[in-house]
Amino acid sequence: MKQNIIAPRAEADISHTARATVFPDGRVRLMIADRPIFTEPGWEARERRAPRQRGAEPTAESMARAARRARRRLYDLCWANPQLEYFITLTLDAARVGDRYDLAAQGKRLTRWLDNAVRRKQLAYVIVPELHADGAIHWHGLVSAGGLHFRDSGTLIRPEGGAPMMPRSAAEYADLIEAGAHRVYNLADWRFGFSTAVRLYGQREAALSYVSKYITKAQASGLGHIGGRWYLHGGKLAEPTVYTYDLAYDEAPDGAYEHIISQIGARCKIYDYYPDRESGEILEG
């Protein structure tokens, strides 16, 4: 639904207490809030304040609101595309890009490489910048394997998690792999700096939350946008479908868990499920 700028609607008419996000694999995430906080798709709130002067900086409130929208969209986009199965970290060497601290210059170089990988290697990706303590910029995201080449770095992540470690011997390496350790790869196609890649393991939801949190970090650190965007994405990516309607908070299904949206002080119950396509039975997930 496209926004009708000729006949705007009152906020009360387009705000609802429930939102269902339906993913291509049939999974549904139902969210029920204690008040109407979900806006119908295609509508945006009209600014009640005086319009921002040309060239003026956006307010902290508008930046936070934009970051929340971007984080939610990033999360949903990643959920809708299970082929995004590798978590990667990339850096750009100063000798290649000229300035490790210049977001625009890095974004331009990275985007060019990503575009080539989409065309030549059928890459699909979602990538977010992160500002490190020293001011340098790293890039984190999820990518499809596509035609990329992964080279074993020799380091592992222990079965219980933690930072990558280098086994002291081939025997220890083999023992850790047998115990369920996870290989850390380097991206052989990436020649502009450092890279790591780890195939996702464990709960996918935790990995997606980990990726989307970088938008919050970027907004808090004042890192800014890449050409007006909070994150980069490309390749063949499926989109979820969003529906809004009204349900009472206590109508949430059994098994829903409560979540506090701290930015707006709203309570929300979340329920994830898969409707069985043949029987119609609801399968929790």
Feature map (PLM): residue ranges:
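Right-hand nucleic-acid polymerase module
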Residues: 1-135, 145-285
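Short beta-strand->loop micro-motif that forms the acidic, two-metal-ion catalytic signature
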Residues: 140-143
